Amino acid sequence: MRRWATEGVRVQMCVTSPPYFGLRDYGHEGQIGLEQTPEDYIAAMVEVFRCVRDVLADDGTLWLNIGDSYANGGRKTRDKLAQRGMDTRPADPVWIKPKDLIGIPWMLAFALRADGWYLRQDIIWHKPNPMPESVRDRCTKAHEYVFLLSKSERYFIDPEGMQEKAIGGTPGNTKPTKGGRAYEDGAREHRTAANLHNVGARETRNRRSVWTVATRPYKGAHFATFPPALIEPCILAGSRPGDIVLDPFMGSGTTAQVALQHGRQYLGCELNPNYETLQTERIAGALK
């Protein structure tokens, strides 16, 4: 990305899901996620997103999906993590107690804000099919965060891309009345429930900040992949057809696939060469 910046490359938006802190070992030197402390992880992430900001258009946005992590909790937990494919697990700093929720998403969000990003919104990714957890002293985790950040105070958002289907409620510009619903403005003949005939009814509304998106496995991927349905509203709201979408943690290539399906271009980075076949398949499928 540093080379792209010196060459004058500019992207309209970045949508990405980086490796989570202490979750798994991808088996590659220089990987992010196995730093010894949360602070080291956050510092590494801030540096990555400085590079992103250098290639981001002045009116561009960053859509960042990030999950949280729990403290080790002792040898038993570390053994379970090792069985899931992790060779090593960062040691917990002294200020974190066993079983503590670390708070990685907000640590990162605040660090990025302190580094100059505008922190515009926290979006809740609600998972209706969360990963089962064998816990009895807390709820099963069924959400992650998507943070919307911008490079500048004013930035591009497509209002239509920020819409979602309206669900229930009263039609637009109506209010409850004793005899039903009254239309608050417009022609007088439309101001009673009997003559309303759905005048002003809204088919869409401004998207809410809780997005329900099921996780979906992808054939050939060893770990969880970024759901296309989570990426799609980000790309539609944050870019125009023909714009370039960046994913610095490309993984299996979901961001590239969704970008191409909606007439955007893409740029991506990925440390693990094992993902190359998956990326090629997804990109080829999007171009058909």
Task: Pin down the residues of each PLM region.
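Core catalytic lobe of class I
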Residues: M1-K288
